[in-house]
Every structure is written in C-alpha cells, then in structure tokens.
C-alpha cells in the first residue's frame, strides 16, 4: 500500500508536474492495484487550505474532495487509537500534528509514504518515496 501525504495528494490532483517521476510512477502503480490511500486528516488539511484561500480547487470543496478520492479510488484511512498513540512516540519528532498522523498512518499500515517532506524522510522506520 502507498499513503499520500497532503501535498502529494494536492499535486496529484491539481499540479501533477510537481510530483517527481518516481512518485508519479509509484502513485499510478498503486492506483492501478487498488493499493493507494490517504489519511483522513489530509481531507481536513485541504479544507483548511481552501478556507484560508491558500488553495483553489477549482470546484466546490466537498465535490473536489469526492473527485480526488474517486479519481484514484483512494482508501481514506481513519485515525485509530493505535495511530493516535503511534503518532506521539519518540520516533516522530515532526512538529506538525497532521504530518505526525499521516506518517504514523503509513507506518501502522506498513505502507510507503509519498512525501517531499525532508523531515519525514529521516524516519528510519518509514519508507518515504519522492
């Protein structure tokens, strides 16, 4: 399975040229195999970016989110008690709570994470692709 972080999700939907060729290949392969996901907190992050006018989805927000999910048949993974607890372990030193949840989600599900975030690439227990 592959988990996309919020930026990778946005890039895939709106600006695919911002993805690296490797990230795009991994996303496409995972999508074809039905093994692509995101954390539910990414939907909230996108909503916040739209509310703050830092992202223009080009459509009504709810419809945009549904379209993003349907375009790749994304599995939206919930924050479970295990993921919440894992996100607070010492291995996650990232200051952004959403990034902690997203990386803990990938780790919990034994998934690769698609992310350009250099801090997340330093997590030795997590395979980060970019």
Predicted regions and their residues:
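Short loop/helix-cap segments at secondary-structure boundaries that form the rim of catalytic
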Residues: 120-126
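Active-site neighborhoods of divalent-metal-dependent phosphate/nucleic-acid chemistry enzymes
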Residues: 56-62, 70-116, 129
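Acidic-histidine catalytic/liganding microenvironments
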Residues: 33, 71, 123
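Glycine-rich, flexible loop/turn motifs
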Residues: 15, 51, 73, 97, ...
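Short, flexible helix/strand-to-coil boundary loops that buttress conserved ligand/catalytic motifs
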Residues: 13, 23, 50, 88-91, ...
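Short, well-structured N-terminal submotif of metal-dependent ribonuclease cores
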Residues: 1-38, 52-67, 109, 118
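Phosphate/NTP-binding elements of NTP-utilizing enzymes
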Residues: 46
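Alpha-helix capping/helix-boundary segments
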Residues: 8, 42-43, 83, 102, ...
């Amino acid at each position: 399975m592959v988990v996309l972080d919020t930026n990778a999700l946005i890039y895939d939907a709106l600006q695919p040229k911002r993805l690296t060729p490797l990230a795009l290949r991994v996303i496409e392969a995972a999508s074809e195999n039905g093994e692509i996901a995101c954390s539910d907190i990414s939907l909230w992050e996108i909503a916040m970016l739209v509310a703050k006018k830092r992202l223009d989805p080009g459509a009504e927000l709810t419809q945009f989110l549904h379209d993003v999910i349907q375009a790749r048949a994304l599995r939206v993974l919930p924050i479970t008690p295990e993921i919440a607890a894992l996100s607070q372990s010492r291995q996650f030193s990232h200051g952004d709570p959403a990034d902690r949840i997203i990386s803990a989600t990938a780790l919990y599900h034994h998934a690769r994470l698609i992310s350009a975030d250099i801090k997340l690439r330093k997590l030795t227990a997590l395979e980060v692709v970019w």
